[in-house]
Each structure stands twice: as structure tokens, then as C-alpha cells.
């Protein structure tokens, strides 16, 4: 559970709250726990970076949470630029990771590309880095398509391509301006 400081800024989740023992206690004491078919959590969701700019050491969060869950979703709605500034190395879900996939959790990040990058309103991206329990691409795609519009706005999709190309070609320079 995130915290608020004296200025009302939300986050971060304290490190002890991510530890396996704490998560196990919270799960067993949850009012719906007795109705669950199994007590094994599937996914942890972490807002990284918050609206106020609070971000996590993603590697440390993965190491802690990965002891309890196989999948971590970093909601990085306001953080699509992190890869392009060395100051944020290791602090975003799609960070460079030399660990073998079987030794780390699967990481999903979502970026509301329209918020801080050059994409049209409502444009967003989902990124997946498979780990010890890879996502089934066909199942994921089927679920995604079930919730996507049958009448997509192609200008929004094109703006994602333009934004990606802009950042791919000059993102580091743009982040230093």
C-alpha cells in the first residue's frame, strides 16, 4: 500500500511491504482469502513513477516482489521517457537486464504515451519482458483484442509509431534539452 508524505505526495511503497513475509500475512488476513481457490498471488502492480515523480529501483522491486509473484506490472503512465535518460537506469520496468529469464519475473509495463511523449491523446503502449513464467502471446493478444475497438483510430496508432521513431532516433538528446 503506498504512503503519503506530509506534503500529500503519494508513494513509495515501503520496502518491508514488498517482502514475502509481509505479503503472505496480508494475503491470509484479507477478507476474501477464504474464498480464493489458491493462496498464490499472480501479479503485483506498482505505480512507477507516480504523478509526483516518485520512482522505484525497478531491479530491487523485481527482486523482492519476484519472490512472491511471477509477474509484475509497472504502471508507468507518466514515465515513458525513462529509458532515454541515463539518470533513470534501472528505475523503469524495461531496464536492461542481463539476468537469465528463468531467474526473474515477467515484467509488464504500460505507458500512456500521450502524456509526456509526442503521441495523440489516448495513445498508450504495453511492453512485455518475459521471465520465469512467460506470457502466452496468443492468449494475451486474444484478451487484448477482446477489449480493443473494432474501429481503431489509425491516427492514434500512427502517432505511436512517430513517437517511437522520434525517441529511437533522438530520445537521449531530447531528454537533455
What is each residue range found by the language model?
Residues 1-177:
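Conserved PLP-enzyme active-site core in the AAT-like
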Amino acid at each position: 500500500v503506498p504512503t503519503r508524505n506530509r506534503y500529500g505526495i503519494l508513494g513509495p511503497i515501503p520496502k518491508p511491504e514488498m517482502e514475502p513475509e509481509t505479503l503472505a500475512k496480508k494475503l491470509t488476513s484479507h477478507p476474501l482469502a477464504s474464498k480464493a481457490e489458491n493462496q498464490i498471488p499472480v501479479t503485483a502492480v506498482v505505480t512507477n513513477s507516480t504523478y509526483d515523480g516518485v520512482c522505484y529501483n525497478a531491479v530491487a522491486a523485481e527482486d523482492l516482489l519476484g519472490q512472491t509473484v511471477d509477474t509484475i506490472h509497472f504502471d508507468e503512465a507518466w514515465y515513458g521517457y525513462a529509458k532515454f535518460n541515463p539518470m533513470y537506469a534501472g528505475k523503469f520496468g524495461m531496464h536492461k537486464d542481463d539476468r537469465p529469464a528463468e531467474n526473474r519475473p515477467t515484467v509488464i509495463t504500460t505507458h500512456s504515451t500521450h502524456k509526456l511523449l509526442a503521441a495523440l491523446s489516448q495513445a498508450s503502449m504495453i511492453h512485455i519482458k518475459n521471465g520465469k513464467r512467460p506470457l502466452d502471446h496468443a492468449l494475451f493478444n486474444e484478451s487484448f483484442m477482446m477489449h480493443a475497438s473494432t474501429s481503431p483510430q489509425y491516427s492514434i496508432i500512427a502517432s505511436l509509431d512517430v513517437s517511437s521513431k522520434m525517441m529511437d532516433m533522438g530520445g537521449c538528446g531530447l531528454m537533455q534539452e
